[in-house]
Amino acid sequence: MKEAAPVEGAKATESIDALKVRIRELEKEVDRWKSQVKSVRYGLCWQDVPEAFDKDSEDKIPVLEEVSEKAIDAAGPLAGRPPHVIIEGDNYHALTCLNYTHRGKIDVIYIDPPYNTGSDGFTYKDRRFLTEFPDGQKVPREHPLRHSYWLSFMEKRLKLAKNLLSDRGVIFISIDDNEQANLKLLCDKIFGEGNLLTTFPRKGTGGRQDSKYFAIVHEYIQGYAKRLDKFESGRMAKGKNFPLFDESKNLHYKTQLLRKWGDNSRRENRPNLFYPIYYNTSTKEFSLSKSKNFLEIYPMLDLNNEGCWRWGKKTMEEAFHKGLVEIQKNRKGEWIPYERIYDNPNEESTKPYSSWIDDIDNSTGSSLLKEILQTHDFSYPKPVDLIDRIIRMSSMQKSTVILDFFAGSGTTLHATLNLNKEDGGNRRCILVQQSEGENNICECVTYERNRRVMCGYTSAKGERVEGLGGSLKYYKTGFVGKHPSKNASDADKVELAEKAGCLIALAENTLETVALPKAASGFFQIYSDNAEKKRYTCIYHNGDYERVPEFIDRIDELRKNDKRAKFAVYVFSWNSPDFFENEFDDLTNIEIKAIPKPILEIYKALNG
């Protein structure tokens, strides 16, 4: 018993020391919070929860690695165009890599992040509880940190995304009521309140009954410009804002709900606007008088709540006679009256409208995906027409670069391919998607959907659909070194230089690998684009310079084959590439750059 006392005393001392350490940590946390609260004068304030990542990626340097067997080069109308890109991996790491390859180069970003409904599977890895939840926690609706987790998750990614936008660039974010208000304030903070484009209400996955009082049928798209003074909105062509066609009038038109919505839309608000209209499904006639074989239709908000029409009886009667009313049957079999709004035939195009509440139903995204993949194991894919509209109104240019870093089913690339085919454009699309689920979503849905669109497929109905053609490169995020970028050792820098080939090729938009002897590939790599006027990216990544003469000879050989070709030459150097400049005195159209220092400098800046 006497011998045990010192042991117990030592244990008590250890516990006290651990408690002191924990107290100091909590004091630092309190000080950090006090500082944050003092700095906020107006706007959004939440508990910024530190995020953890997979163990293999912690404290390492992110790179991209090509999966060459997934490359696509398909014949068809879009063959020979610049390649598109899919990146498989956590979008935080992918965005970090893109901050080197595409800073200031992206014209349009569209994302469809988790809505944080409490049941959509949103998972957050709270660094403080990794031992308890190593794979992260699904965030239920009643979780006390539900909104803080989501805001912490989104803020990091949106800050990285902002760096990628060109001066004329724009970002559009799909969201619903769960986080729309928070997202608006977060984007005001990141992009600037003065760069708000608008909040677009749009038709969502209709008729959700999870709300106690209303059947929720709307969502939002939050839009911001990098610099509003540089933004040029594309105008919508006929058939886009007015997607329907009336052969009798030879005019395009769109429809708008005849029942009033929003404020003052209930019967008690406007009793004089609550009355029946009558419709004959055989003759397509309308009437305000009860007649045989005519349906009686009231402006119902839902089965038990009475609404009101937008027009009084006189205006309604006039609209009947002018052919400005039509009836559509919804998925529940209910007959719903709509106003027809006709296009102005004297205008070739029009400004985009800020409300998309009456068109582009989400259900079309599900049906199309099922047609292509012949299976449907993906919830709420966005419709192609929605992304088409966003791209069109984001720019009048046909060579924009588009990014979606919550790619999901890959709709954004599909829409880009369709639009390029329609107008002969050279738009390029980059998709980023995590490898979620037992069946890797990125491989089995994002990639496979677009592989079929490019190469052709047999639909669920057994019909052959010809491919659009085009090319695509597939990458995965990878990691090098044993330290984060700010503490990179010499060994880390050597490994980064050796593994940075795909990053550099993507930055230069030269994604085709030039074949080299196996022995040479351990020292240098060469990439090219697929354009008629060639550009080459040549990378000498080894610290041993014994093969530099062979490297130079290879470049000279390519230059002689095409004297118009341009070359970007990257060389491993601890500081600057001055050592190599004399070696290239006799060669023209060559720019020499050092690696890996510029990559590390960008990564360090991102991590503070």
Language-model segment annotations:
Residues 94, 98-101, 154-158, 164-165, ...:
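Phosphate/ATP-binding catalytic cores across multiple sugar-kinase/actin-like superfamilies
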Residues 76-77, 92, 101-170, 178, ...:
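SAM-dependent methyltransferase catalytic-core segment centered on the flexible catalytic loop
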Residues 19, 25-33, 205, 227-371:
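Active-site-adjacent helix-turn-beta-strand microarchitecture at beta-sheet edges
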Residues 154, 167-168, 177-242:
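Signature of N6-adenine DNA methyltransferases within the class I
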Residues 1-110, 115-156, 576:
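DnaQ-like (DEDDh/DEDDy) 3′-5′ exonuclease domain used for proofreading
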Residues 46, 53, 135, 151, ...:
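Conserved S-adenosyl-L-methionine
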Residues 86, 117-133, 345-382:
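Active-site-adjacent "gating/activation" loops or surface patches in catalytic cores
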Residues 418, 422-608:
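PRPP-dependent phosphoribosyltransferase catalytic core
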